[in-house]
Amino acid sequence: MEKTRKLTEASLLTAIFVVVTIISVGSGIGYGIYLDYIVPLFYFIIYLKCGSKYTVLSAMSGLMIVFAVLGNPGTAIWASQGIILGILCGILSEKKTSLMDDLLLGTLIGSIIMVFIDIYASKLIGYSFIQDFKETISYMAKYMTKNVPAFSNFPPEFIHSYFSTVFYVSITLIPLGTVVGVYIIGLFVGNRLNVLKGETKKKYEVIRHFRTFSRMTFCSRNLFYIMVIYTMTFSLMNKYGIKTNMAYIDTIMNCFFYSGLYFLIRDSVAGIQGYMLTKGKSMGQVRLFTILYLFILLSYFWLAAIIAILYFMSIDVKYGLREFYCEKMSTLLTN
């Protein structure tokens, strides 16, 4: 009976997906917010409601119908990216991992998915979003160097490095923004539909009361250290000019670097804030520290980032901040 119910629900939701996709793409709005956010959100909910088996069945049948009706391989390709990201968010949300682990791992895996979908799209329909965006950034660099006096005073190496950073940060924001947005909104929608249970319910409560739990949730220690080692290694490779000739691999490595760096700094600042509170500092002092740190981070990025990460690592090992706040958060969630 349960299997029949899930199959019926998956079939109904698949029909809705097909109809809405055809209308959205046919009206011209499908290549905007719909394929990038609504599709992954939709399949995140299907996963929570129907489970992995029926979600995969729904995805395969839905994509085949959309492709058969529209005859547009591009739509099927970009929709498949959204579906995979939605299912990924569903899988991560059910794991006994921290919220930050889910978001970081989702971003890292999402970067790989995005690149491979782009490769597939370039081979099938002759269009590569990454290459097109890279050409746009390159054109901007040449234009600003020629027409903006402030840029003409800098050496070519600096300009190339600056716009390369802009390119890779912008590319990184795509999987990061998609995963974080779909994950958070999906849990709120899932709660409204009463499909959350177990770990997904706990993570929903953490997000719902994030103002309270923001200083208590971190990436796991192992994942944190892995990203520290990776960012250090990647920085040294860049410093000594060690690069791969494969553009897509280079894109993935840079996405990993900037995603990891963001979560390392975020965890470090949150950990230091939490440590200050355990030592009796007031919220006003914590806020003042945060404002001053952000100012220093904008002025001396690498110095501020390294100091915060190393200091957080030292107090975490010395005082067991992760264990302390994990236990405290569990107590608050059960009350």
Task: Set out the residue ranges of the language-model regions.
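Hydrophobic alpha-helical transmembrane segments
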Residues: 7-12, 56-60, 76, 80, ...
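Hydrophobic transmembrane alpha-helices
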Residues: 1-58
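Central hydrophobic cores of alpha-helical transmembrane segments
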Residues: 57-65, 102-111, 282-295, 307-309
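Short helix-perturbing small/polar motifs within transmembrane alpha-helices
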Residues: 8-14, 79-122
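Membrane-interface interhelical loops and short interface/amphipathic helices
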Residues: 118-165
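Interfacial aromatic-anchored transmembrane helix boundaries in multi-pass membrane proteins
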Residues: 22-32, 63-91
